[in-house]
Amino acid sequence: MPGDRQALRQSLYRLAAGQAGYFAASQALNVGYSYQAQKYHVDHGNWVRVDRGIFRIPEWPTGLHDSLMRWVLWSKHRAVVSHDSAAAAYGHGLVNPAKVHLTVPLDFRMDDPAVVLHHRVLPEADVRQLDGAAITSVTRTVLDVIESHVDEELVESVIDDALSAGALTAGQLRRRLCELGEAERARAERVLARVAP
């Protein structure tokens, strides 16, 4: 019996390792932890309940982007970290979002006051992984910031940081500007004329 418990724990830890120490109740159930066992582990301090149906291993080292994984699990892996939250995770720009920005499928209906949802179908090429969480690519992130902000200083800070970090070239961004509306495209061109003439 102790070997079974150890095998269960190892399976759960392997799963949590790819998710910044987080896991969902449904994932624990799939590994072999009944709901009663889940309650036991929370009550005895073996797991921390982060939200309804979302847990974390308490001794797991914290990382810079840990909280993003929580929201990906909350969405049942349907959300992609995006917009200001993605820019902040990449360290690009003067963004400091008060809420977590997530891009979700058009039929996504969950909601939480701590998140801002953006409904859009994202092509695979626009999605990356960062510490186990799905996040928009740098190019998609920059386009999202251009679309959602009229403050050119903020937009410029994100574009300039992405270019300076080598995460994006001006040519790559210019090729994708056709995806934006006319006002957003003009804003991006003005910024690019200043930072990448």
Where are the language model's segments positioned?
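Short gly/ser-rich loop at a beta-strand->alpha-helix junction or flexible surface loop bordering the NTP-binding
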Residues: M1-P197
